[in-house]
């Protein structure tokens, strides 16, 4: 586990973590953990990077306000648990092509959170989100609000049927 700060009252800000290996929470806790809402960090998980956690009470990555998380590798928790938790306002998650996220993207009770998706034109994806995100597909695909999802053009036979359900 990499702790961004020891306690919520003793926050570190401006930390940069770039991962190309494996960061694993082997006991209770997160792979990357910011204790307080102001524990600011920039986390980049490169294509060979793997971050894992199987603790139902903690996200795999938890960062504070004005933080950014960019994933091109694998970020994994159990399916119903948080993979990435934004613990402060005005943070951004960017999910890049061929990156894998298992678990929820959580911005519950936070404001100004942005989810940017960059999987390529016409690609399909689905992410379970919790809380309020501004959704951006950087390749121009239409994002279906609710949880973040898009249907690739390869499934054009069902595209019109699925998009009719968007809210």
Indicate where each model-derived feature is located:
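A generic structural signal for beta-strand entry/edge sites
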Residues: 40, 58, 112-114
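Parallel beta-helix/beta-solenoid
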Residues: 12, 27, 38-40, 64-66, ...
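Structural detector of coil-to-beta-strand junctions
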Residues: 1-3, 8, 29-34, 57-62, ...
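Beta-strand-rich solenoid/repeat architectures in extracellular/passenger domains
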Residues: 10-29, 42-58, 68, 72-81, ...
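Ordered, small/hydrophobic-rich secondary-structure cores
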Residues: 78-79, 84-87, 91-93
